[in-house]
């Protein structure tokens, strides 16, 4: 993808850096591509259970060159499109449920640490606390749905 195609999607350098980090979480063997197997591993770690057919569909949706895998350029295109989708409230609700393990309507530091750990992100207590602090508007040391939505919309 050309630089202008990326800039047409209006991704900031910071967003591209964040997506690079996310991409490397999916790209388990570090070969620069995401396979259906790698995608499945990450989705299962997030509590999803996609079928092989669903994984192929997800890859095919963004696999511009048709080689059966997603490279970083294709991943960026997918993320840029996702960010443009205004109808992502349902996705945000689903993401909140993934983090809110006990279903009490709040994401605690422990729940955040658990999900990040499943994603392969080993965070220190300080890093987890910092993430909570950044999103925690009312100062109760946990993230409610409204705070989560605000945080997701800022991305």
UniProtKB/Swiss-Prot annotation:
InterPro entries: CALM/Myosin/TropC-like, EF-hand-dom_pair, EF_Hand_1_Ca_BS, EF_hand_dom. Ca(2+) 4 binds at residues 136, 138, 140, 142, 147. Signal peptide: none annotated. Ca(2+) 2 binds at residues 63, 65, 67, 69, 74. One of its GO terms (cellular component) is motile cilium. Keywords: Calcium, Cell projection, Cilium, Flagellum, Metal-binding, Repeat. Ca(2+) 1 binds at residues 27, 29, 31, 33, 38. It is found in: Cell projection, Cilium, Flagellum. Pfam families: EF-hand_7. Its main location: other. One of its GO terms (molecular function) is calcium ion binding. Ca(2+) 3 binds at residues 100, 102, 104, 111. Residues 14-49, 50-85, 87-122, 123-155 form the EF-hand domain. Gene3D superfamilies: EF-hand. Transmembrane segments: none annotated. This protein has four functional calcium-binding sites. Belongs to the calmodulin family. Calmodulin mediates the control of a large number of enzymes, ion channels and other proteins by Ca(2+). Among the enzymes to be stimulated by the calmodulin-Ca(2+) complex are a number of protein kinases and phosphatases. This is Calmodulin, flagellar. The gene is CAM1.
């Amino acid at each position: 993808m050309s630089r202008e195609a990326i800039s047409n999607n209006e991704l900031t350098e910071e967003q591209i850096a964040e997506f690079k980090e996310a991409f490397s979480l999916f790209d388990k063997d570090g070969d620069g591509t995401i396979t259906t197997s790698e995608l499945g591993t990450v989705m299962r770690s997030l509590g999803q259970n996609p079928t092989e057919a669903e994984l192929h569909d997800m890859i095919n949706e963004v696999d511009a060159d048709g080689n059966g895998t997603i490279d970083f350029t294709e991943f960026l295109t997918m993320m840029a499109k996702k960010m443009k989708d205004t109808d992502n409230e349902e996705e945000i609700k689903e993401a909140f449920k993934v983090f809110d393990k006990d279903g009490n309507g709040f994401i605690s530091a422990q729940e955040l640490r658990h999900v990040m750990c499943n994603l392969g992100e080993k965070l220190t207590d300080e890093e987890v606390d910092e993430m909570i602090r950044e999103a925690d508007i009312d100062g109760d040391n946990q993230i409610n749905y409204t705070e989560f939505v605000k945080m997701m919309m800022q991305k």
